[in-house]
Amino acid sequence: MDNVERLMEFGLTRHEASLYILLTLEGSLNGYEAAKQSGISRSNAYNALAGLVDKGAAYIQEEDTVRYTPVAIEEFCSNKIRHLEQKKTELIAELPGKRKNEGGYLTIKGEEHICDKIIDMLLCAEERAYISVYNERLEMFREHLEKMVSEGKKVVIITNEPFDLQGATVYLTECKKEQIRLITDSKDVLTGAITNRYEATSLYSSNNNLVEVFKDALANEIQPVSYTHLTLPTKL
């Protein structure tokens, strides 16, 4: 993901994001200069500059000609996040709660969405989490696993190489690089494969039978890390 795409995540169009980056490099520009330097047509450039002003990403600087100057990136992003947090609070308060998934099977596609679901499961876990994942991918979940440990929750990691996480139990086994499996609180399970950013699919469920199947599967693949002298768990 490049900086244009990152800015688009904050609600800017591609033209707006491109001109915002140009403004941060140049300091301030008028519409003609912005169009000329960006290669965007003059009409599209003026529309994009007006959009930046409307979205809180640029200010108008009144001189002989109207010029545009960028809002600092930290200020712009923080403002967006603050407004979104406020809207999130309002939506949670006003919209009805989601009915719990009663044992259905949900397909989640895309690496980002799968990782988001894993993080949500870790955040919502009340007692324990068992995660089986390739060592290279574990790092993106470290913060949330550490939080669980700090709260006194049980964390068991099954991976292919030693992973240093104080307070967690680590087991080594032959993990497939693309495979991810997670069980939280013996109630929810996620299993899937991430081959690349876009070709990734996982299955999420709270179906008791599926949870039991994967609990048995994880128990069977666990091998204690030699340097910790751990004992095999009898129950996940």
Annotate each PLM feature.
Residues 169-218:
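HKD (HxKxxxxD) catalytic microenvironment of the phospholipase D
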Residues 33-36:
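A short acidic, leucine-rich amphipathic alpha-helix
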Residues 74-147, 156:
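PLD-like (HKD) phosphodiesterase/transphosphatidyltransferase domain
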Residues 17-27:
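Short amphipathic alpha-helical interface segments
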Residues 8-14, 30, 62-82:
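Short, cationic-aromatic polyanion-contact patches
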Residues 53-61:
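A short, conserved structural fragment
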Residues 228-234:
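Conserved small/polar residues in nucleotide/adenosyl-binding loops
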Residues 1-9:
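Short, Lys/Arg-enriched N-terminal segment that forms or immediately precedes the first helix
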